[in-house]
């Protein structure tokens, strides 16, 4: 498989990692009246890409290049993810990705990562094994950060899929910029709003999405 094919496969929403059950905070944002249509969805996606997307991609890029050991990467992710619910969601998605990765690369020492690693840590190892360039691995993570929330909003608000796709096309340049920034070094930021949404969603009775 070429690196481009790997990139497309990892960015495919049909990848069987369980990511489709996570909304990235958009369900709670809609419930709170913060996202009501396309304009507010675009604003939310920009905010999420610039914070969570950048953070996840930067840690993955460091693991990918071998600059950050997996134990250190796990601790760095915890330190940059204040909300327990957000940490749980990250580890849940990491578990889904590592389950798939074990099937694709069965002899690659996955035990080192433990049973529930953060998504960024697994993604960094996967990127290195698959032959992706670090910037392309970062881009795929930024991209799925955006599209995961966009697709969830489309379902929850019954938005026109074509209109939502237009929004994601308009944010493609931002995704490229954030991916480049992620490869420059570890991001050191969090977003209190996204952390609050994650915690409130975790307390919700029978939500449609896990996070």
UniProtKB/Swiss-Prot annotation:
For the region Disordered, give the residue spans.
71-93
Which family does this protein fall into?
Belongs to the UreF family.
**Can the keyword Cytoplasm be found in this entry's annotation?**
yes
Major subcellular location class: cytoplasm
Lineage here is:
Bacteria, Bacillati, Actinomycetota, Actinomycetes, Mycobacteriales
**GO CC term (a single one):** cytoplasm
**Which residues are in coiled coils?**
none
Entry keyword set: Chaperone, Cytoplasm, Nickel insertion
**Highest taxon above the source species:** Bacteria
Q: What is this protein called?
A: Urease accessory protein UreF
Care to name a GO molecular-function term for this sequence? nickel cation binding
Location in the cell: Cytoplasm
User: Pfam families of this UniProt entry?
Assistant: UreF (PF01730)
How does it associate, per the subunit comment? UreD, UreF and UreG form a complex that acts as a GTP-hydrolysis-dependent molecular chaperone, activating the urease apoprotein by helping to assemble the nickel containing metallocenter of UreC. The UreE protein probably delivers the nickel.
Briefly, what is this protein's role?
Required for maturation of urease via the functional incorporation of the urease nickel metallocenter.
């Amino acid at each position: 498989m070429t690196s481009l094919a790997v990139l497309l496969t990892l960015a495919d929403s049909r990848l069987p990692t369980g990511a489709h059950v996570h909304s990235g905070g958009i369900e709670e944002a809609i419930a709170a009246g913060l996202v009501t249509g396309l304009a507010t969805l675009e604003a939310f996606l920009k905010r999420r890409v610039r914070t969570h997307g950048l953070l996840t991609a930067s840690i993955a890029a460091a693991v990918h290049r071998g600059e950050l050991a997996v134990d250190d990467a796990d601790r760095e992710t915890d330190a940059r993810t204040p909300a327990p619910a957000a940490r749980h969601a990250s580890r849940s998605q990491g578990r889904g990705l590592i389950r798939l990765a074990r099937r694709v690369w069965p002899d690659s020492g996955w035990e080192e990562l433990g049973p529930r690693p953060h998504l960024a840590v697994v993604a960094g190892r996967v990127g290195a094994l698959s032959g992706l360039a670090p910037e392309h691995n970062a881009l795929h993570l930024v991209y799925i950060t955006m599209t995961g929330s966009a697709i969830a909003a489309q379902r929850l608000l019954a938005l026109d899929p074509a209109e939502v796709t237009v929004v994601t096309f308009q944010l493609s340049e931002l995704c490229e910029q954030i991916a480049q920034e992620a490869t420059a070094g570890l991001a050191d930021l969090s977003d209190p709003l996204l952390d609050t949404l994650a915690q409130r969603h975790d307390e919700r009775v029978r939500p449609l999405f896990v996070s």
